[in-house]
From Swiss-Prot:
Catalyzed reactions: N(2)-formyl-N(1)-(5-phospho-beta-D-ribosyl)glycinamide + L-glutamine + ATP + H2O = 2-formamido-N(1)-(5-O-phospho-beta-D-ribosyl)acetamidine + L-glutamate + ADP + phosphate + H(+)
Enzyme class: ligase
Pathway it works in: Purine metabolism; IMP biosynthesis via de novo pathway; 5-amino-1-(5-phospho-D-ribosyl)imidazole from N(2)-formyl-N(1)-(5-phospho-D-ribosyl)glycinamide: step 1/2
Subcellular location, record wording: Cytoplasm
Subunit-structure text: Monomer. Part of the FGAM synthase complex composed of 1 PurL, 1 PurQ and 2 PurS subunits.
This protein's name: Phosphoribosylformylglycinamidine synthase subunit PurL
Role description: Part of the phosphoribosylformylglycinamidine synthase complex involved in the purines biosynthetic pathway. Catalyzes the ATP-dependent conversion of formylglycinamide ribonucleotide (FGAR) and glutamine to yield formylglycinamidine ribonucleotide (FGAM) and glutamate. The FGAM synthase complex is composed of three subunits. PurQ produces an ammonia molecule by converting glutamine to glutamate. PurL transfers the ammonia molecule to FGAR to form FGAM in an ATP-dependent manner.
Binding residues for Mg(2+) 2: 102, 248
Underlying gene: purL
GO molecular function: ATP binding; magnesium ion binding; phosphoribosylformylglycinamidine synthase activity
A cellular-component GO term for this protein: cytoplasm
Active site: 34, 80
HAMAP family attached to this UniProt entry: PurL_2
Organism, as annotated: Pyrobaculum calidifontis (strain DSM 21063 / JCM 11548 / VA1)
Chain positions recorded as Mg(2+) 1 binding sites: 78
Length: 693
């Protein structure tokens, strides 16, 4: 039971009686935090979501962003944290399947996946078991349905050893004429298609709305079926002309799908639960109602279009059931073998109470006095950190070329670049970022950092940012410090979106991410999507022998929350880097003017990590004088490792900013004037920076 005494009383008042078992199942599922956003939806309206190019914003299964007249891109982010903690393979695989189906709801063809993953330290046996299972689940599902995994990020921290944060983003494309037209009316049919209902994932939404304990709840984890998922993708590409609306049958099962659709269209809905095709004949009506069996969609169509759909169901060998009909009157009615087993007002079901929790601010540990360590050892330690390391051990498990759209592949640049085959050379640029240490130290500034980092990655790759989606992952909102984190994170996201002119068109909040009474560091992930007019001119994080190396932006004494501070001193302290939105917008202008083909931003791990990444990517060394970098600090370790925002590197004959070095030879040399600070062969760097799982 996920309902409180106050909620049960509200249900009794709304019904004028006690709920039946089926009605109780409905409210338990649909009023869960996972489905109803009880603790968060009142605050999320603060996020700006409108722009002339936003056709459809938050509130339904997937948004729509116009990238050219008559052509839309959709993208959405989803978390599958609790399931991945207890069954990493299926938890991650079903997370990917669910986000793909969200994209299908607007009739789009899924063209790419990105994953933002947060695990415990890779040397920990349990964390490694989770990481390996999650990566395998994502790989198997994405490869089998033919949707490439083109990018993302992976973060390692002790907080995620038993409570991983597993985020998947799917991108799709659809022409305006292929978006289901809506206009649902009384008499229209409610059809369930896909896998047969079973008990896998039963109570999954309630499970995701409570804190994890040592007692694993494997029964609440759904089981993936990528072959059925692929059939649904193919079905939708033809069926979109025969339907009025498509909805994913995911969290909350039929309970949530029925309540949301009836509410959105201002209608009632009558469903015969026993008519749903099942793979478990022992299920009762309440179980059928809240089953979260994967690979299922709801299609809404008129009686006259049913023959069109039936032919497609047969063509793609997709099971289906016509189980309900929309009605006048505003009631949700559920039947089982002819008997009414549930009858509730739509508005009661659709409007869970809004919760507002108390908040309690905290102050993070101030930055201690830091002695300067031996720089060569410090550089090696930061570059070999699993957070800075090259993630080939993960992305090489993924098929990132399927679909022939991927232009800039994982590891090659700051963001994924995909060709829109429908528009010739026009494409999209997409990147997701998060830094849990930043959002722990300052939730507001940390959230803003995630936004500007993703924004800058897209810009440096030559994209023009259009829209963003976010994912906020926290502990229990009943903890005043955690709810304060949420409130502050929303403010940080709102400030960044408003200042940069990039609307937030969707998102996800996941709460109760705790283990044994310990909440995680907050994870606020932001995925920014941009447009590029010619994918052949996208920038990659590389250089060639003879290139000048140019740095634009000012390095400040900003090592609060940095990888350097944690790896060398074991500290999580200080303030995250400041954000200057005018500087970030100036980078957009500069990139548009200079049009670099070889570039990277400076972020995690500082200038040392950015230079090492470009050397490893290109196989060419460099000679760099870090003391030529524009800076507000003279400490050499801060010049190397500060994570100040508003900086990027370009390589070529000329570039914006200050020339700090030249690409040459087979070694990376970092110096200050005539003093050599660090020297390593590129092949040694490649080995040093290789993540091992």
């Amino acid at each position: 039971m996920a309902l409180t005494a106050a909620e049960l009383e509200a249900i009794r008042r709304g019904l004028g009686r006690g709920p039946t078992p089926v009605e109780l199942a409905l409210f338990t599922a649909h009023w869960s935090e996972h489905c109803a956003y009880k603790s968060t939806r009142g605050r999320l309206s603060r996020l700006p979501s409108k722009a002339p190019w936003v056709v459809k914003g938050p509130g339904t299964d997937a948004p729509l962003v116009e990238v050219a007249p008559g052509l839309y891109v959709t993208f959405k982010i989803e978390s599958h944290n609790h399931p991945s903690a207890v069954d990493p393979y299926n938890g991650a695989a079903t997370g990917v399947g669910g986000i793909i189906r969200d994209i299908l709801t607007v009739g789009a063809k899924p063209i790419a996946l990105l994953v933002n993953l947060h695990f415990g330290p890779p040397q920990d046996a349990h964390a490694k078991w989770i990481a390996q299972g999650v990566v395998r689940g994502i790989s198997d599902y994405g490869n089998r349905v033919g949707v490439p995994v083109v990018g993302g990020e992976t973060w390692f921290d002790e907080d995620f050893t038993y409570t991983p944060i597993v985020l998947a983003t799917c991108v799709g494309v659809v022409s305006a004429e292929d978006v289901p037209r809506g206009g649902v009316e009384a008499g229209d049919l409610f059809i369930v298609v896909g896998s047969g209902a079973d008990k896998s994932g039963l109570g999954g939404s309630a499970f995701a709305s409570k804190t994890l304990t040592e007692e694993e709840d494997l029964g609440a984890v759904q089981v993936a079926d990528p072959l059925m998922g692929k059939r649904l993708i193919d079905l939708v590409q033809e069926a979109r002309q025969c339907v009025k609306y498509i909805k994913d049958l995911g969290g909350g099962g039929l309970a949530t799908a029925a309540a949301e659709l009836a509410h959105w269209f201002g209608l009632g809905l009558e469903i015969d639960l026993d008519k749903i095709h099942m793979s478990d004949a022992e299920m009762g009506p309440a179980e059928v109602l809240i089953s979260e069996t994967q690979e299922r969609l709801v299609l809404v169509t008129s009686e006259g279009q049913l023959p069109c759909l039936k032919a497609l169901f047969e063509k793609y060998d997709v099971p289906y059931s016509v189980v309900g009909r929309f009605t006048e009157g505003g009631r949700l009615v559920f039947k089982w073998r002819g008997e009414v087993v549930g009858d509730v007002p739509v508005e009661l079901a659709a409007n869970a109470p809004v919760l507002e929790w108390p908040t309690r601010p905290y102050k993070a540990k101030p930055l201690p006095d830091l002695p300067q360590p031996p720089l060569d050892k410090a550089i090696d330690a930061v570059l070999s950190s699993p957070n800075v390391a090259k993630k080939a051990a993960i992305y090489e498990r993924f098929d990132f070329d399927v679909g022939v759209r991927t232009v800039v592949k994982p590891g090659e640049g700051d963001a994924a670049v995909l060709k829109l085959l429908e528009l010739g050379d026009v494409g999209i640029v997409v990147k997701g970022d998060a830094n849990p240490r930043y959002t722990y130290l300052s939730p507001r500034l940390g959230a803003a950092n995630a936004f500007v980092k993703a924004y800058r990655n897209v810009v440096v790759a030559r994209g023009i940012p259009l829209a963003a989606v976010d994912s906020i992952n926290l502990g229990s909102p009943a903890r005043p410090e955690v709810y304060w984190q949420f409130v502050e994170a929303v403010e940080g996201l709102a400030e960044a979106a408003e200042a940069l002119g990039v609307p937030i068109v969707g998102g996800k909040v996941s709460l109760y991410n705790e283990y044994l009474d310990k909440p995680i560091k907050p994870v606020v992930a932001v995925v920014v999507l941009g447009k590029i007019d010619d994918v052949g001119k996208a920038a990659k994080a590389t250089w060639e022998a003879g290139d000048g190396i140019y740095l634009w932006g000012v390095t400040k004494a900003e090592v609060g929350g940095s990888e350097y501070l944690y790896r060398i001193f074991g500290e999580v302290a200080g303030e995250p880097p400041a954000v200057d939105y005018a500087v970030e917008k100036e980078i957009l202008r500069l990139v548009g003017t200079w049009r670099p083909r070889k570039a990277t931003d400076v972020g995690l791990g500082g200038l040392a990590a950015a230079l090492a990444k470009m050397a490893v990517n290109s196989g060419v060394g460099a000679d760099v004088d870090i003391c030529k970098a524009p800076a507000e600090t003279t400490r050499l370790d801060f010049l190397l490792f500060s994570e100040s925002n508003g900086r990027f590197i370009t390589a070529g004959e000329e570039g914006p900013g200050v020339k700090i070095g030249e690409a040459e030879g087979e070694k990376l040399r970092l110096r200050c004037g005539g003093t050599l600070l660090y020297k390593r062969k590129v092949e040694e760097l490649r080995e040093l920076m290789a993540l091992r799982l």
